[in-house]
């Protein structure tokens, strides 16, 4: 019975570690959003306010996916 508990605990840790790989995509997505924002500012400086609001929406959606991955990792680890 003790071996089964050890296997269960180790599989929870492995699953939690794999679930956090979604955070890599969120980090890359935020970099892409703000990189494209800088390019858009340099091409059309007159639209800075409008472009910045679009970038914040993109940032929020990208971070939401990352937070969902983090929540799933904690659920796998502790439940």
Curated annotation (Swiss-Prot):
PROSITE patterns to which the protein is assigned, alphabetical: ATPASE_C (PS00605)
GO biological process: proton motive force-driven ATP synthesis
Record's keyword terms, sorted: CF(0), Hydrogen ion transport, Ion transport, Lipid-binding, Membrane, Mitochondrion, Transmembrane, Transmembrane helix, Transport
InterPro entries the UniProt entry points to: ATP_synth_F0_csu, ATP_synth_F0_csu_DDCD_BS, ATP_synth_F0_csu_sf, ATPase_proteolipid_c-like_dom, F/V-ATP_Csub_sf
Entry keyword annotation includes Electron transport: no
Recorded coiled-coil stretches: none
Subcellular location: Mitochondrion membrane
Bilayer-crossing regions: 21-41, 59-79
Predominant place of localization: mitochondrion
UniProt key word Mitochondrion: yes
Alphabetical list of Gene3D superfamilies matching this protein: F1F0 ATP synthase subunit C
One GO cellular component term: mitochondrial membrane
One Pfam family named in its UniProt record: ATP-synt_C
Domain of life: Eukaryota
Site, as annotated: Reversibly protonated during proton transport: 63
Membrane topology: Multi-pass membrane protein
Molecular function in Gene Ontology: lipid binding; proton transmembrane transporter activity
Family designation: Belongs to the ATPase C chain family.
HAMAP family to which the protein is assigned, alphabetical: ATP_synth_c_bact (MF_01396)
Complex and partners: F-type ATPases have 2 components, CF(1) - the catalytic core - and CF(0) - the membrane proton channel. CF(1) has five subunits: alpha(3), beta(3), gamma(1), delta(1), epsilon(1). CF(0) has three main subunits: a, b and c.
Function, as annotated: Mitochondrial membrane ATP synthase (F(1)F(0) ATP synthase or Complex V) produces ATP from ADP in the presence of a proton gradient across the membrane which is generated by electron transport complexes of the respiratory chain. F-type ATPases consist of two structural domains, F(1) - containing the extramembraneous catalytic core and F(0) - containing the membrane proton channel, linked together by a central stalk and a peripheral stalk. During catalysis, ATP synthesis in the catalytic domain of F(1) is coupled via a rotary mechanism of the central stalk subunits to proton translocation.
Annotated protein name in UniProt: ATP synthase subunit 9, mitochondrial
